[in-house]
């Protein structure tokens, strides 16, 4: 069976399923089903294939300048929030669920990579990070700025349209032109790729810098003196030892939350803005604040999810207080899937939480659990409320979609946004006769490629990392899965589908060699 014969499986499957869910069933709304707790993680996938893709009220006019807020959570698995099937007895996410109730929830949203830096690069530029010098893993704490200052980003595009722009939260895309010297001005940096304001954790939660960045300098830097032995991080390792106020892990999320909300409160109606807010939860170390500690039966990891939800609520409250909600598009998602590593995660799973929902694998891996993430879009009156969609999309599509959203033509495919597809019609709930994305390439922490097209997922199985971890050896060989019938990637069907393998392998090579995948 060829790819062409299966290309439209999603739409065909939706049509078949919508004809007769099951004999004797009494139809109920998705909202009522969620209220009754009828959808687990796998059930939500099924529900979205039963026709919950409603038409949008209206299309934005070219040149509209709505405010835009992107909330990119960290390591949040598909099944970690209520509107994606998390058990409400273990975790409650009323603010994220509010976004889903007031907006549109996607069940097949994917990150470009199953780790942090590459996804953040792809989100802002519309280009897969494996096209750069970073072929596996993430940027280290001293890495130079990874986005070329000449490369268009969402922020630089919007800034040219008169938007005020800010990044608050985890940056993890490097500073300066060579090895970062945190005692000096951190330029080039976010300001050189379109952001007017920055308040950031330089790399990761619990990273070796131990500090915040505000503007172009370490916040509160007193001198250029370094004392590496003075401070230890959560792993017991020496910090860089910067002579500046040190972050307290339990206070990082409240600090970022307040900075994001405060920046929003400074905005004035009629002057468009773009906030890229990247909270550090639910990345390790698991450090809920005093306000959420002990709030979840799933333990500290559940508390950490609550911390994220509380932060989302503060952002939404700031928009409400300023009367900006109706004029603001909010996109909530995650940089990759959840992570199994850690005592707190293990305790949460032992309690019954399923952070990756029905998917195999987690962060770092080539399996679906590494890429499938929550993805919710809200824009009152434009994005249809309380709807869901199973269109295959990528976070890399954010650039092209926002460009269409504000009426800006994309640059030539060889110049920018090389891997970004316009999925605005999916955001708006408009009917589509064929998939918006004919294919999608994903990439693991070890540099393993996979390509999806229709129901098929082809894993090339060749790690770029010189010494990949033995624990992930089952990813390091070619394999083919039919996700339409095997969402858990349990049965390799390459031997019975040689034509599909040949087509997908050729597609992957073509997209790599020509320098772009956008069509």
What is each residue range found by the language model?
Residues 2-7, 13, 19-479, 485-519:
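Formylglycine-dependent sulfatase
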């Amino acid at each position: 069976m060829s790819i062409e014969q299966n290309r439209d499986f999603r739409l065909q499957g939706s049509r078949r399923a919508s004809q007769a869910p099951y004999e004797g069933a009494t139809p109920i709304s998705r909202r009522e089903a969620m209220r009754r707790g009828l959808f687990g993680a796998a059930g939500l996938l099924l529900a979205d294939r039963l026709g919950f893709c409603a038409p949008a009220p209206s299309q934005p006019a070219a040149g509209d300048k709505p405010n835009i807020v992107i909330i990119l959570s960290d390591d949040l698995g598909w099944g970690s929030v209520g509107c994606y099937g998390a058990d409400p007895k273990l975790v409650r996410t009323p603010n994220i669920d509010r976004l889903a109730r007031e907006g549109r929830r996607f069940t097949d949203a994917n990150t470009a990579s199953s780790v942090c830096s590459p996804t953040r690069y792809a989100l802002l530029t519309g280009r897969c990070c494996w096209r750069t010098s970073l072929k596996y893993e993430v940027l280290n704490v001293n890495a130079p700025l990874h986005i070329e200052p000449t490369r268009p980003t969402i922020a630089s595009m919007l800034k040219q349209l008169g938007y005020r722009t800010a990044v608050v939260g985890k940056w993890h895309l490097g500073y300066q032109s060579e090895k970062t010297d945190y005692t000096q001005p951190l330029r080039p940096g976010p300001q050189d790729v379109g952001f007017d304001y920055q308040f950031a954790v330089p790399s990761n939660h619990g990273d070796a810098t131990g500090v915040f960045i505000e503007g172009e300098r370490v916040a509160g830097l007193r001198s250029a003196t370094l004392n590496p032995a003075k401070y230890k991080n959560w792993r017991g390792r020496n910090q860089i030892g910067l002579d500046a106020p040190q972050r307290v892990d339990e206070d990082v999320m409240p600090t970022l939350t307040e900075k994001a909300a405060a920046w929003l409160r400074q905005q004035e109606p009629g002057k468009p803005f773009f906030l890229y807010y990247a909270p550090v939860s639910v990345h390790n170390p698991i450090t809920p604040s005093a306000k959420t500690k002990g709030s979840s039966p799933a333990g500290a990891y559940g508390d950490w999810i609550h911390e994220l939800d509380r932060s989302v609520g503060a952002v939404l409250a700031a928009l409400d207080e300023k009367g900006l909600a109706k004029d603001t598009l909010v996109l909530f998602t995650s940089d990759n899937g959840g992570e199994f590593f850690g005592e707190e995660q293990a305790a949460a799973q032992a309690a019954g939480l399923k952070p990756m929902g029905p998917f195999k694998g987690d962060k770092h891996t080539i399996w679906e659990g590494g890429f499938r993430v929550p993805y919710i879009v809200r824009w009152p009156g434009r994005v249809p409320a309380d709807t869901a969609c199973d269109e295959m999309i990528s976070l890399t599509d954010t650039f092209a979609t926002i460009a269409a959203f504000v009426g800006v033509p994309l640059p030539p495919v060889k110049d920018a946004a090389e891997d970004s597809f316009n999925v605005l019609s999916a955001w708006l709930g408009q009917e589509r006769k064929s998939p918006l994305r004919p294919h999608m390439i994903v990439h693991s922490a070890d540099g393993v490629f996979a390509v999806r097209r229709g129901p098929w997922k082809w894993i090339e199985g060749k790690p770029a990392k010189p010494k990949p971890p033995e624990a992930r050896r089952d990813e390091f060989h070619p394999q083919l899965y039919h996700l339409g019938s095997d969402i858990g990637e349990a049965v390799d069907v390459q031997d019975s589908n040689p034509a599909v393998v040949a087509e997908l392998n050729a597609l992957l090579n073509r997209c790599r060699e020509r320098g772009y995948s956008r069509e």
